Amino acid sequence: MLVLILEKGAANHGPHVVQFSTEHTAYIFQLDNPESHNPLLYLLAAENIKKIGFDLTSDRKLLLRKFGVLPRGFVDLCRIFKRMGYRSTVGLRAAVAIVFNEQFHKSKHATMSNWGSPILSDSQLIYAANDAFAALRVYLSLSKDADIVTLINKI
């Protein structure tokens, strides 16, 4: 199981970065680096590997357009929260607040930084890893509830 987060940056030429997280390791793929394409395409196409994220419809379309491969095995946490009764779109920050009653701080500087840069800064790498890991924690916490697991399996 992996968490999928895309960083698009300020320009509309993204996505530039895809980050995945397991419970122990974050993986950050720079999409402008051709060396990252083969392992990334394998992960995206593998239906047996769950990719967790928020509001993934547009991300899947962007990846399909960029690589010509339909990403499979996605679990969209926004859809789970909607089925749980939340009317507004729930993103990562709101999900952390709902599930853990904690604030998830995101650096505005890192959010708005140049994700298309050939070399990412340490703050960008930390931001990307934290984003993916926080989403994984939300999913794992929700997965402890049998009713929510039923919702996940229906989607």
Segments predicted by a language model, with ranges:
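Short hydrophobic beta-strand that contains or immediately precedes a catalytic carboxylate
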Residues: M1-I5
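Conserved DEDDh/DEDDy metal-dependent 3′-5′ exonuclease domain
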Residues: L6-S141
